[in-house]
Amino acid sequence: MACFATKQPLLLSLLLAIGFFVVAASAGNFYESFDITWGNGRANIFENGQLLTCTLDKVSGSGFQSKKEYLFGKIDMKLKLVAGNSAGTVTAYYLSSKGTAWDEIDFEFLGNRTGHPYTIHTNVFTGGKGDREMQFRLWFDPTADFHTYTVHWNPVNIIFLVDGIPIRVFKNNEKNGVAYPKNQPMRIYSSLWEADDWATEGGRVKIDWSNAPFKASYRNFNDQSSCSRTSSSKWVTCEPNSNSWMWTTLNPAQYGKMMWVQRDFMIYNYCTDFKRFPQGLPKECKL
């Protein structure tokens, strides 16, 4: 990735506006980094904090959230998705702020029947408004092993990556009147839940509870390239080498890989859905 240090004055103004200090961020284990928030025992941490699992049965799903809030960062998580007949299930992994005008950056993994591919559903919300969906298939089986899903969020762009391969970029086009998430710290959330009214083939394929409990697994959480704060902190802290990721965009090789993914594996792009937007596509689609 290329680094644009010439934008440091803008970075400084952003940091001072929120209240940043520059200190080292660290990748913690799941005990240190997350709280299990719901599921009544259906989410659990194992291996001295190195493995977390969420399960779903007919009574309830489960979920967890980060102890810290983030304002920009490169956040990695390895996931192994629900195997077998996962139709009607959703594994969500996203960042979100609070309030009615929230910001949000989404990965959602929509289950499918045995032998049929998962759908990766991505979205970006700004000020409580989303409608920026892009959906993809994967070029591997996401249930056979762990794979890395990354949100790289900085003042320039939001990059969605799978195993280091970019699949989508949402650029900061505020100068052209497009809102961009840059002022509201967000927590990381993840959950496994039932959504068979829409998740698989628009809700035509329902969940088969005879396959329960369904399980998604997590490893290797890494937030070492980030700016964050705890609930008890007023200030957001950045790791000292923040300039290595704070202004990065795709280099030509990475852009080429993203074009490969979007050509061969994208199945929905809101920027080409003219029926959905009869009054005209969203502004960022034309830039």
Swiss-Prot record:
Binding site for xyloglucan: E108, H121, T122, N123, D131, R132, E133, D197, W198, G202, R276
GO molecular-function term, one example from the UniProt record: polysaccharide binding
Site feature location: Important for catalytic activity: D106
Post-translation changes: Contains at least one intrachain disulfide bond essential for its enzymatic activity.
Phosphoprotein among keywords: no
Cell compartment(s), UniProt: Secreted, Cell wall; Secreted, Extracellular space, Apoplast
E.C. code: 2.4.1.207
GO cellular component terms given for this protein: apoplast
Main subcellular localisation: secreted
Matching SUPFAM superfamilies: Concanavalin A-like lectins/glucanases
Any one of the GO BP annotations: cell wall organization
Expression induction or repression: Down-regulated by aluminum.
Function: Catalyzes xyloglucan endohydrolysis (XEH) and/or endotransglycosylation (XET). Cleaves and religates xyloglucan polymers, an essential constituent of the primary cell wall, and thereby participates in cell wall construction of growing tissues. Has some preference for non-fucosylated xyloglucan polymer. No apparent XEH activity in vitro.
Sequence similarity: Belongs to the glycosyl hydrolase 16 family. XTH group 2 subfamily.
Name of the molecule in the record: Xyloglucan endotransglucosylase/hydrolase protein 14
Source organism: Arabidopsis thaliana
Lineage: Eukaryota, Viridiplantae, Streptophyta, Embryophyta, Tracheophyta
